[in-house]
């Protein structure tokens, strides 16, 4: 009986404690002062503790870095409302792109464009053909780091040079790749911190001075009309079959409803070919496999020469060379990129690695303080440090995109750069913030925060790789146009997570929704 009374008493105490605690941490609509700040701290800690409380929890062992500030425009001050490991360096994945894109936004301007010139040895136009109509000694194309250049641009250029019926021959088709100083590596265009599996995936395309279709290409796989037969491979554009031999190891499967296509591709370091394996459904129709271009220079020379030859222009020789070395070359054709504003928007919405790496190298070519021997990417990293003025003790950045796991950045430095760009007097319309994905509406956030208070008012950059998730941005209750509203800036990073990314994303989103409710109630 005595034990029963003790147990009953303990249960009553536990219930009373939970009631008191529940009342303490409830987020009241009218509470936006210091008590409200204390409440938000307790609530965020509860979310993280519930996630990591035991080994059976979905994110047990995950390392968290979280920082949140409230911005009051009436006094221009940022007040911290939550901080956990804000000075600890984490691998942030694509949140690294904030450093790269904000730096080029500050210094190059939204109207910046990239111009890719096509030089000839004599004046040439599509009508007259130049002083000697039938032959050019060379066409030299100088890559200038335009990540948006497409195969359609090449087709347009080929039509320009072949449109004159008297134009019959080009002795040399040259590609000038000297815009980047690539250093002494085996292939200095390949980011040194990237892994082979990155380079053989489309998200890890190599950032070369001349880029076509984001340095990717499509292979069209057609199933055999005989079960057990080999599918066939084809290409859309001239010259692609010469550039990339395809070895088919796949087979055509049966017509049963359970039959599905399981095509995969792989490269071998000792081979110029690509290997296609798996099964191809006989009734599945043509499948398109998009693959990275591992030798972008050779791809350009092979495909552009084939396009010219399709137009009746003979190409005698192709090579890597130098344009305008005599100062007497003539710029006969030019490809112009979209404005930087459009390219930044695309980069941030899609989290495009190639664009970010190209921006890094653009800044490297612009960095006059770098020595001549400094590789362009390294000069770009130094330029970012000079531009953002973030102490190097708060971050280590090794690439422009965040694809490397050797980037180590503190939540404090991430929230600082996003706060600074929002309050930048040179961007009164908050154009940069407008380029970021918007909760439930656009980009990599289009499927997150749906039917929540955060929908439409959270602008943030996502980051994700195995074991890593991050989100850095701002909550603007009244949208971008209200400069007098209070807002919340945040940076959340999770590292070493054993859980599926979706589980960690859910925790991050819970925190952001909580912060959203807090600012809406203040």
Curated annotation (Swiss-Prot):
GO terms for biological process: peptidoglycan metabolic process; protein catabolic process; proteolysis. It holds the Pfam family Peptidase_S13. Disruption phenotype: Not essential for cell growth. It catalyses: Preferential cleavage: (Ac)2-L-Lys-D-Ala-|-D-Ala. Also transpeptidation of peptidyl-alanyl moieties that are N-acyl substituents of D-alanine. Substrate binds at residue 461. Its EC number is 3.4.16.4. The keyword Transcription does not apply. Inhibited by penicillin G. Keywords: Carboxypeptidase, Hydrolase, Protease. It comes from the Eukaryota. InterPro entries: Beta-lactam/transpept-like, Peptidase_S13. The keyword Hydrolase applies. Disulfide bonds: none annotated. The active site is at 94 (acyl-ester intermediate), 97 (proton acceptor), 351. GO terms for molecular function: serine-type carboxypeptidase activity; serine-type D-Ala-D-Ala carboxypeptidase activity. Belongs to the peptidase S13 family. Since D.discoideum amoebae do not have a peptidoglycan cell wall, the function is not known. Carboxypeptidase. This is Penicillin-sensitive carboxypeptidase A. It comes from Dictyostelium discoideum. The gene is pscA.
């Amino acid at each position: 009986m005595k034990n029963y009374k003790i147990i009953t008493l303990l249960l009553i105490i536990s219930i009373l404690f939970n009631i008191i605690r529940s009342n303490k941490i409830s987020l009241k609509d009218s509470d936006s002062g210091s008590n409200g700040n204390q409440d938000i701290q307790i609530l965020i800690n509860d979310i993280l503790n519930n996630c990591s409380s035991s080994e059976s929890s979905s994110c047990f062992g995950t390392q968290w870095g979280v920082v949140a500030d409230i911005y009051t425009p009436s006094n221009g001050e940022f007040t911290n409302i939550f901080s956990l490991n804000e000075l600890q360096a984490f691998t942030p994945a694509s949140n690294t792109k904030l450093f790269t894109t904000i730096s080029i936004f500050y210094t190059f301007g939204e109207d910046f464009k990239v111009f890719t010139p096509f030089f000839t040895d004599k004046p040439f136009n599509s009508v007259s053909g130049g002083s000697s109509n039938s032959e050019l000694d060379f066409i030299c194309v100088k890559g200038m780091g335009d990540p948006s250049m497409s195969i359609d641009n090449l087709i347009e250029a080929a039509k320009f040079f072949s449109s004159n019926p008297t134009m019959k021959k080009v002795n040399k088709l040259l590609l000038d790749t000297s815009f980047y100083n690539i250093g002494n590596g085996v292939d200095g265009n390949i980011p040194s911190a990237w892994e082979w599996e990155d380079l053989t995936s489309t998200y890890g395309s190599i950032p070369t001075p001349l880029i076509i279709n984001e340095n990717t290409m499509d292979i069209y796989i057609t199933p055999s009309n005989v079960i057990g037969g080999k599918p066939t491979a084809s290409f859309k554009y001239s010259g692609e079959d010469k550039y990339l031999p395809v070895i088919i190891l796949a087979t055509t499967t049966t017509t049963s409803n359970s039959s599905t296509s399981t095509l995969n591709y792989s490269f071998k370091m000792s081979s110029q070919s690509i290997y296609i394996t798996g099964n191809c459904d006989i009734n599945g129709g043509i499948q398109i496999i998009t693959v990275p271009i591992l030798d972008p220079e050779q791809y350009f020379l092979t495909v552009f020469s084939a396009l010219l030859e399709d137009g009746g222009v003979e190409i005698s020789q192709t090579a890597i060379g130098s344009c305008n070395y005599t100062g007497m070359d003539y710029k006969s054709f030019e490809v112009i990129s979209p404005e930087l504003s459009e390219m930044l928007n695309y980069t941030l919405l899609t989290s495009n690695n190639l664009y970010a790496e190209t921006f890094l190298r653009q800044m490297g070519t612009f960095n006059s303080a770098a020595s001549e021997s400094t590789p362009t990417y390294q000069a770009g990293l130094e330029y970012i440090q000079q531009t953002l003025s973030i102490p190097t003790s708060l971050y280590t950045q090794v690439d422009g995109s965040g694809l490397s796991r050797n980037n180590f950045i503190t939540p404090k430095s991430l929230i600082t750069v996003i706060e600074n760009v929002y309050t930048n007097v040179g961007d009164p319309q908050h154009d940069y913030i407008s380029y970021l994905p918007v909760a439930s509406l656009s980009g990599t956030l289009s499927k997150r925060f749906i039917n929540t208070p955060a929908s439409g008012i959270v602008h943030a950059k996502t980051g994700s790789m195995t074991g890593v998730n991050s989100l850095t941005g701002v909550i603007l209750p009244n949208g971008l146009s209200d400069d007098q509203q209070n807002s919340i800036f945040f940076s959340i990073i999770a590292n070493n997570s054993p859980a599926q990314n979706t589980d960690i994303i859910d925790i991050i989103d819970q925190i952001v929704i909580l912060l959203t409710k807090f600012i809406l109630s203040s």
